[in-house]
Amino acid sequence: MSALRRKLGDEYQVVSTSASGGGLPPPRAAPRGKRQRFVDKNGRCNVQHGNLGGETSRYLSDLFTTLVDLKWRWNLFIFVLTYTVAWLFMASMWWVIAYMRGDLNKAHDDSYTPCVANVYNFPSAFLFFIETEATIGYGYRYITDKCPEGIILFLFQSILGSIVDAFLIGCMFIKMSQPKKRAETLMFSEHAAISMRDGKLTLMFRVGNLRNSHMVSAQIRCKLLKSRQTPEGEFLPLDQLELDVGFSTGADQLFLVSPLTICHVIDAKSPFYDLSQRTMQTEQFEIVVILEGIVETTGMTCQARTSYTEDEVLWGHRFFPVISLEEGFFKVDYSQFHATFEVPTPPYSVKEQEEMLLMSSPLIAPAVSNSKERNNSVECLDGLDEVGIKLPSKLQKITGRDDFPKKLLRISSTTSEKAYSMGDLPMKLQRISSVPGNSEEKLVSKATKMMSDPMSQSVADLPPKLQKLSGGGRMEGNLPPKLRKMNSDRFT
């Protein structure tokens, strides 16, 4: 622990450990009422189907699946009851044959041949059926060739016994081999955490495999269950949204040999785009995690589920490391599987962080739509001049217009994400700027209109001196070599 603290720093503190306790409890919001979960922590879905009406007959049409889905106590009850009824029914049939033939009468001489030897009451008929069905064959009771009805009943008994054995034993085998118990050795962390990873706000939780046998083709999916109302007024109580845990990159395909931390990057496409530490205290949602894979030993598909409600998501936490390198192998400490520690995390949502970054960056200015926003843009650009962001002296010489209004140049630069110099402005706009009496608002309106026009101008729009210099093209031939290179780079 001390070595880990030296590695991570003293500012990190363990705030949550395994279910056995230890460590400081994670911070909790104000106590709420009991939260109704859609999926329990053990993966059981809290859904009950009612008012089926006549649809219950569909369960009998798929009787085998119905028996497999029953609880164990009902399976055992049906198993014992079916065999008991079958045995009593077949024993009664043998007793009826013996009664109708008169084999139960003991007054027969030695020359009389019964249907079944040594069957003279119901218990003896029941024992004969058990010996035949279980192929015990003691040899004391046996069927004779003088009883054709006994031969037919024997064939019927063999067919019926095979059907009952195949149905009930197969049902019990399928139920015992179901991979539900394999899912109990797949662990999920008790809490999910939200913190920064690789410079991005990320939702994280941990999964682990307690067995040495692998989960083949393990894949994980996440669903966000949240109630919402559509613009048409329809209320959706359990709207399901997909959480991206690496579908495009293949990160959802797991090699689950050691505990893994599953990450969902919160971005503009995430349902948690506007989720902050403050709004999470009032939100109500449930994150359902589904882990699927093929059991290596049986080849059957296994699915493990769990869920995290809003009060089980810790803001500003990170999971404790559980893997250490020993001599020749890696050791996993599952006592720290659920442990988290606090890390510095901004309490704002990703949307709020992007808005603050946009407002704080002077190079990203919105389009000028009204006088208030225009004045704010001009003031922002005035601040840039104060910190020393000016045009290079060579580019100032290119413009050759010292009397051009600086505010107009700034405002025109806000109409596009690309900053233009004086030389990039159209010649009509340059002539307008030199006319006295033009107010700033008129210049702004004309500048906006001119900047929306194509930047390419004809030679007729140039002054006569520039027409002569340009020779029907650009003035690149009269520029110094360095400025000619700069100008060519700008237009490419």
Swiss-Prot record:
Gene from which the chain derives: KCNJ3
Alphabetized InterPro entries for the sequence: Ig_E-set, IRK_C, K_chnl_inward-rec_Kir, K_chnl_inward-rec_Kir3.1, K_chnl_inward-rec_Kir_cyto, Kir_TM
Family: Belongs to the inward rectifier-type potassium channel (TC 1.A.2.1) family. KCNJ3 subfamily.
GO process annotations (BP): potassium ion import across plasma membrane; regulation of monoatomic ion transmembrane transport
Subcellular localization: Membrane
Protein name stated in the entry: G protein-activated inward rectifier potassium channel 1
Functional summary from the UniProt entry: Inward rectifier potassium channels are characterized by a greater tendency to allow potassium to flow into the cell rather than out of it. Their voltage dependence is regulated by the concentration of extracellular potassium; as external potassium is raised, the voltage range of the channel opening shifts to more positive voltages. The inward rectification is mainly due to the blockage of outward current by internal magnesium. This potassium channel is controlled by G proteins. This receptor plays a crucial role in regulating the heartbeat.
Oligomer and partners: Associates with KCNJ5/GIRK4 or KCNJ6/GIRK2 or KCNJ9/GIRK3 to form a G-protein activated heteromultimer pore-forming unit. The resulting inward current is much larger.
Stretch list, region Disordered: 16-35, 452-492
